[in-house]
Each structure stands twice: as structure tokens, then as C-alpha cells.
């Protein structure tokens, strides 16, 4: 697992180990022990999966009363992903970060207190 920080405090791109051969590939998509060691402990309360057609914009979404962190991954196709820091006491308050996600081994960690959304670039994603 490789961690690449960005301009949003606490956010990062996680590049998972991908094992590939003639049969296909294998990726361990989440390991609580590794995640906690690299990023910290967060209780995950929900797991969502969506499929969107090209040109669909989802977001920007955020939670006011019960902020949630998100692990965002595009397993098929490509998306233009955006996060905005809405944490008033954060040194990156009101800053944004964008990335094209198009590899199943890449996951964007979006800490609690962010607005998040994405735009579908490919036919489906």
C-alpha cells in the first residue's frame, strides 16, 4: 500500500498492491490494520456502490450533523472526482482537490467534513 498526500489536510490517495497474472488480478481493497497504521482509525458505517452513465454528476454531497469519511474508488471506467474541505478549523478550509480515478487499485480517502462529488467521464463508471 502506497500513500500519496494532497493539499487537503488528512486526505490522500491510497494505491493498493495489485497482483496480476494470466488469470486476471487480485487486490485486497481494505485492511483495517494497515489503514489504521497509515491513516488512523475511522468507524465505517456504510458501504455504497454506484454505476453512472457518461455525463452524470453526483454531488457535491456532505453530512452536517454526522460527518462521514469516504473511500472512493472507480472499479470500471473513469470519473473526475472532487473534494472540498468544509472544516472551519482546518488549515485547508475551502480548498479543493481534484483527481481522475480510473484504476481499481487507487482509492481516494475523503476525511469527515468534506464535500464530495464526481463526474462520469467514460461510457459508464
Residue ranges and their predicted role:
Residues 100-123:
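Conserved metal-binding segment of the jelly-roll/cupin
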Amino acid at each position: 500500500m502506497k500513500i500519496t498526500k494532497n493539499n487537503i489536510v488528512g486526505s490522500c490517495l491510497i494505491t493498493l498492491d495489485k497482483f496480476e497474472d494470466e488469470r486476471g488480478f487480485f487486490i485486497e481493497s481494505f485492511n483495517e490494520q494497515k489503514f489504521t497504521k497509515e491513516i488512523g482509525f475511522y468507524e465505517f458505517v456504510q458501504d455504497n456502490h454506484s454505476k453512472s452513465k457518461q455525463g452524470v454528476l453526483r454531488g457535491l454531497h456532505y453530512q452536517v450533523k454526522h460527518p462521514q469519511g469516504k473511500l472512493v474508488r472507480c472499479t470500471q471506467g473513469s470519473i473526475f472526482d472532487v473534494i472540498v474541505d468544509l472544516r472551519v478549523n482546518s488549515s485547508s478550509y475551502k480548498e479543493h482537490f481534484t483527481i481522475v480515478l480510473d484504476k481499481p487499485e487507487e482509492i481516494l480517502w475523503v476525511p469527515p467534513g468534506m464535500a464530495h462529488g464526481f463526474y462520469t467521464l467514460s461510457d459508464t463508471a
